[in-house]
A protein has these predicted regions:
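Conserved glycine-rich Rossmann-like NAD(P)H-binding loop of the short-chain dehydrogenase/reductase
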Residues: 65-82
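Active-site helix of classical SDR
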Residues: 164, 200
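SDR active-site lid
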Residues: 212-274, 287, 291
């Protein structure tokens, strides 16, 4: 009987493994089939890092869902470019451009929050999408210059937290608010070659999960998004051999991010394989996950230095410059 049951379970196991292999998000995220448009329509959504990459694509998709948008980044000209490309009920004419440097200090951030809260009559910020981040080319943990270390922490952690602290009181007065935090797979598992960036994302994950636990009963929600390698305008994913690393498109990442936010998911993972599998292993079998990272860590740093594929499974078998 036991043998018969095993054979009966094989098709189910095959389907599960096939799903995991083909999926570009975690199981909970993949179970949500569509964006809940009613959660977005006519809502005020503030996006940092909106001048390029995932932030730009999020702006385009949210505008098409009839959201009221506030776009922030340091480059005002690029924000205007993005604004002029948007279409929707409120776009482009009613899209607000709000230049912002997360490392500019509390007074500057407070001024930005006050402006964001006043842009739309009788409507404050409903969604705050923390997308802005500072990331340097891959290097060893010991080779990060002090300037890059400070910039990473100031923007990814301190500036993001300060902006949140200044915005939350407005949300609490309304009894609602939702933070969507663009974290990283590097905030879930070790990221050899990205030690400081990884540290900043682990910090952000810890802060925002704690914030949600403290304020959820008061109407404040948090969705943490952990993407793996994404194909953005600032990163073409090409190796020195001219071969492209496997990266998920910005459009797909943005789409799944909006799905996660509108379904009020707590944390989601978005990535192609093998990074998604590594995240599962790190979450549910951490000892194995650390063993894997220890096995490939040094080779991954060397692959980055040589222009190789830093996401190739071949690194596990000693191929430093895997294609």
């Amino acid at each position: 009987m036991a043998v018969l049951l095993c054979f009966m379970c094989l098709p189910l196991l095959f389907l599960v493994f096939a799903f995991l292999f083909l999926a570009d998000g975690d199981l909970t995220l993949m179970s949500k089939r569509r964006v809940k448009r009613e959660e977005i329509k006519d809502k005020v959504i503030w996006i940092t890092g909106a001048s390029r990459g995932i932030g730009e694509v999020l702006a385009k998709q949210l505008a098409s869902l009839d959201a009221k948008l506030i776009l922030s980044a340091r480059n005002e000209a690029e924000l205007e470019r993005v604004k002029n490309q948007l279409t929707g009920k409120y776009a482009p004419n009613e899209v607000k451009v709000l230049p912002l440097d997360l490392a500019s200090g509390e007074d500057s951030l407070r001024d930005a929050v006050n402006k964001a809260e006043s842009f739309f009559p009788d409507a404050g910020v409903d969604y705050m999408i923390h997308n802005a981040a500072f990331e340097r080319p891959k290097s060893t943990a010991l080779d990060v210059a002090e300037e890059a270390l400070k910039a990473t922490i100031n923007i990814n952690v301190l500036g993001t937290i300060s902006l949140t602290q200044l915005l939350v009181p407005f949300m609490l007065r309304r009894g609602r608010g939702h933070f969507v935090v663009m974290s990283s797979a590097a905030g879930k598992v070790p990221a050899p070659g990205q030690a400081v960036y990884s540290a900043s994302k682990f910090a952000v994950n810890g802060y925002f999960h704690s914030l949600r636990s403290e304020l959820y009963q008061k109407g404040i929600d948090v969705t943490i998004v952990c993407p793996g390698p994404i194909d953005t305008s600032g990163s073409n994913g090409m190796t020195s051999a001219g071969k492209k690393e496997k990266r998920l498109s910005s459009e797909r990442c943005a789409e799944l991010t909006i799905v996660a936010a509108t379904h009020h998911l707590k944390e989601v993972w978005i990535s192609d394989q093998p990074v998604l599998a590594v995240m599962y292993i790190g979450q549910y079998m951490p000892t194995v996950g650390y063993w894997l990272m220890d096995k490939v860590g040094g080779k991954r740093v060397e692959a980055a230095a040589q222009g190789g594929n830093t996401y190739s499974p071949g690194l596990l078998f000693g191929n430093k410059k895997a294609n």
